[in-house]
UniProtKB/Swiss-Prot annotation:
It catalyses: tRNA(His) + L-histidine + ATP = L-histidyl-tRNA(His) + AMP + diphosphate + H(+). InterPro entries: aa-tRNA-synth_II (IPR006195), aa-tRNA-synth_II/BPL/LPL (IPR045864), Anticodon-bd (IPR004154), Anticodon-bd_dom_sf (IPR036621), His-tRNA-ligase (IPR015807), HisRS-like_core (IPR041715), HisRS/HisZ (IPR004516), HisRS_anticodon (IPR033656). The keyword tRNA-binding does not apply. GO terms for biological process: histidyl-tRNA aminoacylation. It is found in: Cytoplasm. This is Histidine--tRNA ligase. Transmembrane segments: none annotated. Belongs to the class-II aminoacyl-tRNA synthetase family. Homodimer. One of its GO terms (cellular component) is cytoplasm. The keyword Ligase applies. The gene is hisS. Its EC number is 6.1.1.21. Gene3D superfamilies: Anticodon-binding domain (3.40.50.800), Bira Bifunctional Protein, Domain 2 (3.30.930.10).
Length: 442
C-alpha cells in the first residue's frame, strides 16, 4: 500500500495561531478592558461572523468592499464575513429594537475579516473589541466614548498615547467650500491615506483620480494639515476665521467646542487628546466626531483604537433614525504594540502554584492539596506524574508558575506542603495548606 503523503502544517498569510503565552496575554487584555466597559455601564452582546452580503456591502466604503471575504454558501445565498462589528450592530439594533431599552450601551468582542495586505500589526483575521452608545445625540455620549478609550489604555499600563479627533462635518464643509461637495466621500477616502502615502501622493490622487485642480487639492490638504499643538483655546482661536466658510464647518466646530467643554473638566491628561483635521476615517457611515488613537512610542504601528459618530447607520434597515457613537480597539495590533513596549506579562500559565510530588504514593494527596487550594481561591495545577524536584521545578520555571508546592514523605505524613518561591528561591518547609494559601494570596 502506498504511504499517504503528509500534509504540511501551515497557516494562510494574515492568519495566525496563538501559543499559550500570547493567548493568555490576549485574554488578560480583554478582561481588563471588559471591566472598564462595565464600569461605564456597557453590557455585552454577540453577533454572527457570517452575514448576508447585502447587509455589509451597502455600509462599507469602496476600499472595504474590495477587502470583503464574500462567497455563495451551499444554499446559494450571497454571504460575507463581517469586516467590523459596527455594521452588524446596526442590523442587531434594527432587528431587536423592541427588546432593547434606549439609550443602549453595548460592547462586543470577536473576530472580523479583511483581505488587506498582511504586515506588522495587521492581519486578515483579527479581533475587534467594540463599545457603542446607541440612542443618544448628546455630545456627552461622544465625550464618554473618548473617556472609555482613555481609561482602557491607562488600565493596560499605557501612559503616553494620543487620541486624535476631528469632525466629518468640518471635512464636509471644507469640501463644500472648494466646490467638491459631490465628491466628498472620495476626497475623504484619499485624505484618510495621508499617513500611509504622504502629502504629495494625496495631492496627486486628488488631482488625477478626482479631477480636482492643484489649487483645490492643496487648499483642502492645507486645511486638513491643521493640528492642535497647544491648548484647545489657542487652537479654536486660530481656526475661528475658517468657520465662515460653510454652515457645515461652523456646526462641526461648534460640536468640537462642546466636546472640549466636557473633556477639559475631567481628570484626563490633556496631552492625550488633540484635534487633528487630517483624521477622516475611511468608513462611509461616520457623520460627526471621529477619532483615532496612536501610541506615542510606536506611531508607525497605526491606530489601536478608532471610531466616531454614525447618526444614520440604521437607515438601511429601518425608517426610524437611530443615533450612535462608538469605538473599536484593534486587539491584535494593540497586543503587538504592548509586546514591543515590554508591557506583556510573560507567563505561560494561569496557575499560581504547581503541586508536585516525588513518589507515586503521594500523587492522590497532590490532587487533594490542589483541590483545597482552589477552594481557598488559588489557581492550582498538579504535575501529573511523580518526579524528582529538579524536573518539576524545571517545568514550573518554563511555564512561569510563581510557586511550587512540593510534596514528599514528610509532607504526606503531616498533611502539609513545602512551598518554594520560584522568583527568589525562598522555601517554606512543611507549612499547612492554609498557611501556603495566605502566602499565595499575599
Amino acid at each position: 500500500m502506498k504511504e499517504q503523503a503528509l500534509i504540511t502544517p501551515r497557516t494562510l498569510s494574515g492568519f495566525k495561531d496563538r501559543l499559550p503565552q500570547e493567548a493568555m496575554a490576549k485574554s488578560r487584555l480583554l478582561r481588563t478592558v471588559s471591566e472598564v466597559f462595565e464600569g461605564f455601564g456597557f453590557v455585552p452582546i454577540e453577533t454572527p461572523h457570517l452575514e448576508y452580503a447585502e447587509i455589509l456591502v451597502k455600509q462599507g466604503s469602496d476600499e472595504i468592499q474590495k477587502e470583503l471575504y464574500r462567497f455563495f454558501d451551499h444554499g446559494g445565498r450571497d454571504v460575507a464575513l463581517r469586516f467590523d462589528q459596527t455594521v452588524p450592530l446596526a442590523r442587531f439594533i434594527s432587528q431587536h429594537r423592541n427588546a432593547l431599552g434606549l439609550p443602549f450601551k453595548r460592547y462586543a468582542i470577536g473576530n472580523v475579516f479583511r483581505g488587506e495586505r498582511a504586515q506588522r500589526g495587521r492581519y486578515r483575521e483579527f479581533t475587534q473589541c467594540d463599545f457603542d452608545f446607541i440612542g443618544s445625540e448628546s455630545i456627552g455620549s461622544d465625550a464618554e466614548i473618548i473617556q472609555v478609550i482613555y481609561a482602557s489604555l491607562k488600565a493596560l499600563g499605557i501612559e503616553r498615547f494620543t487620541i486624535s479627533m476631528n469632525n466629518r462635518k468640518i471635512l464636509n464643509g471644507i469640501c463644500d467650500y472648494f466646490g467638491v461637495k459631490e465628491q466628498t466621500s472620495d476626497v475623504l477616502r484619499i485624505i484618510d491615506k495621508l499617513d500611509k502615502i504622504g502629502e504629495e501622493s494625496v495631492i496627486k490622487e486628488l488631482v488625477e483620480e478626482l479631477g480636482l485642480s492643484q489649487e483645490s487639492a492643496r487648499g483642502i490638504l492645507g486645511f486638513t494639515s491643521l493640528k492642535q499643538e497647544r491648548s484647545s483655546e489657542e487652537f479654536f482661536a486660530k481656526v475661528a476665521s475658517y468657520e465662515g466658510l460653510s454652515d457645515s464647518l461652523r456646526e462641526g466646530m461648534g460640536e468640537m467646542r462642546a466636546l472640549y467643554a466636557i473633556l477639559d473638566t475631567l481628570e484626563m491628561d490633556r496631552a492625550c487628546y488633540k484635534i487633528n483635521f487630517s483624521i477622516a476615517r475611511g468608513l462611509g457611515y461616520y457623520t460627526g466626531i471621529v477619532y483615532e488613537t496612536t501610541l506615542d512610542a510606536l506611531p508607525s504601528i497605526g491606530s489601536v483604537c478608532s471610531g466616531g459618530r454614525y447618526d444614520n447607520l440604521t437607515q438601511s434597515f429601518s425608517k426610524e433614525r437611530m443615533s450612535g457613537v462608538g469605538a473599536s480597539i484593534g486587539v491584535d495590533r494593540l497586543l503587538a504594540a504592548l509586546e514591543e513596549l515590554g508591557l506583556l506579562e510573560g507567563r505561560g500559565t494561569s496557575a499560581q502554584v504547581l503541586v508536585a510530588c516525588m513518589e507515586e504514593s503521594q500523587l492522590a494527596y497532590s490532587y487533594k492539596v490542589a483541590e483545597r487550594l482552589r477552594t481557598l481561591g488559588i489557581k492550582s495545577e498538579v504535575y501529573p506524574e511523580a518526579v524528582k524536584p529538579k524536573r518539576s521545578l524545571a517545568y514550573a520555571n518554563s511555564k512561569g508558575h510563581p510557586y511550587v508546592a512540593v510534596i514528599g514523605e514528610d509532607e504526606l505524613k503531616q498533611g502539609v506542603v513545602t512551598l518554594k518561591d520560584m522568583q527568589w528561591g525562598d522555601q517554606k518547609p512543611c507549612i499547612s495548606i492554609e498557611a501556603a494559601a495566605e502566602i499565595l494570596l499575599g
